[in-house]
Amino acid sequence: MGRGKKFVPASKFGDLRQAPSRLNGMATKPRPGYAWTMSESLAIHRILVANRGEIAIRVIRACRDLGLESVAIYSEADREALHVRFATYAYPVGEATATDSYLNIDRVLQAAHATKADAIHPGYGFLSENSEFARRCENEGLIFIGPTAECMALVGDKARARQCAIDAGVPVVPGSPDPVENIAEAHHFADKLGYPIMLKAAAGGGGKGMRLVENDAELDRSFETASSEALSAFGNGRIYVEKAIVTPRHVEIQILADLHGNQVHLGERECTLQRRHQKVLEEAPSPVVDPELREKMGEAALMVATQAEYSNAGTVEFLLDSDREFYFIEVNARLQVEHPVTELLTGIDLVAEQISLAQGKKLSFEQKDVEFRGHAIECRIYAEDPDNDFAPSPGVVKTLSIPGGPGIRDDSCLFEGYNVPIHYDPIVGKLIAWGDNRLTAIRRLQRALTEYKIRGVATTIPLFQRVLADSDFINANFDTGYLDRLLNDASEPTDSITDDCDSITEVAR
């Protein structure tokens, strides 16, 4: 990385005005007097985005809106990537493998210092929830756009975060108070809680190190597998045991908190549609959460945030059972993949808020100012082949047609000729639809998926077309096992959702 490594304007990689653009989507509108006046008093002038792909582009766009300069970092595999073209400046950080580039703290910090960045935005994934990275930023005079390193270490440990929720008086799923030491202790808690149980990694998320266990024999097989998977993914193989909630929904609350003790919640997101414990489709508001339950869950989320001394943007996640009782499961100390649905619902630019809060500014609004309008649904577009057990589908994008029209937002890193690499998470974009109600959002999303043409790599677009055609989804009759059951169903998807939408139930309104 020595010779040839230099600080260069991103325009070296092409005229920004001619770079493939995603500006035809539905942009969030800043509140009057906010985004356009912030730059007059900003302590931050240049932000290094410690990420890649669509989330790097999202942060760079926020920088543009705020009149700030941005620095993209890139690996050898991402030299021609779209986020490199979008940024004010670009800086190489290593080889194609993530451990040699985006996960290499020394190289990322070297890039920040070399480019004279004031702050680092971590996006999601990679180093976004790495407390050591946040601490290094703090120690080296860089503003980390996120919670403090101490807070991140607390909520990043699921066992400690669970105890934090208990101390705050928020209900948690019954389980072991600490990670279990061995299989014998796991059996002890399984006997105490009763099957089914969940094995969960004490660190990390995304479904890694998680197993549903139905009996003693399965526990013997699953414990070692879950622990090994967690160790490989997070460098921490500790496992704790929870009682499994039967047919739950996964509902999360978006929070914002400043360093002056002010907090707000921005309502919930429904994240129940998951494949192998990983979210694939999110929506807001949840079709089963009424204003009373929303307020209760929002208050609980802020109680956890207060107990953890949380600041900046974060998400408090809950399981919701069939009796509408909710249980804390974890805190995500970063911007979520699914943040656009909240932005479309509230009109609040979450990335701009993160940048403001990271400078020690007070929240620019109060809870009473938060309004929810309409309904938004997001599909995560992965370069995976649904017909081949969702195997990764790297390759060159030969043809690309991006959907548009009323209520459609596309957050993507694709362009014709882009070579989708094999080295990273296969998410290449997010397609979001907004409507006055859930039915309108569903119809708009179905239209947009039909318009979305990607040739050269396989994507999960056919999966979402199938989901949107399913009457159980349309009528909001699903739980966290819904998608896996749908995928196991040999029936073919229908060509139209018209008939199902005409009979949609009140729960979608």
What is each PLM-predicted segment?
Residues R22-L23, Y34:
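Short, positively charged and aromatic/hydrophobic N-terminal segments
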